[in-house]
Amino acid sequence: MAKEESIEMQGTVVDSLPNTTFRVKLENGHVVTAHISGRMRKHYIRILTGDAVTVELTPYDLTRGRIVYREAGKKPPTSKAEE
């Protein structure tokens, strides 16, 4: 259904913005604005600052993207008060 193939890149969430939008720093050093994909929204997958994610970019606009996957191994540190 897509006209062009999308570009998938790895990155790290740098900042959380309103309306489930995030700033993601990609492996190549570029910073893009990305939103959560519909499947991640449907399954209530939470994304926090510092999470490693996979971002899908279109060749038309390389400054905006869609977060399609959150790496399971990258968890934010927990506080001692919770233990």
Swiss-Prot record:
Coiled coil: none annotated. Pfam families: eIF-1a. InterPro entries: NA-bd_OB-fold, RNA-binding_domain_S1_IF1, S1_domain, TIF_IF1. One of its GO terms (cellular component) is cytosol. GO terms for molecular function: ribosome binding; rRNA binding; translation initiation factor activity. Belongs to the IF-1 family. This is Translation initiation factor IF-1. It comes from Coxiella burnetii (strain RSA 493 / Nine Mile phase I). The gene is infA.
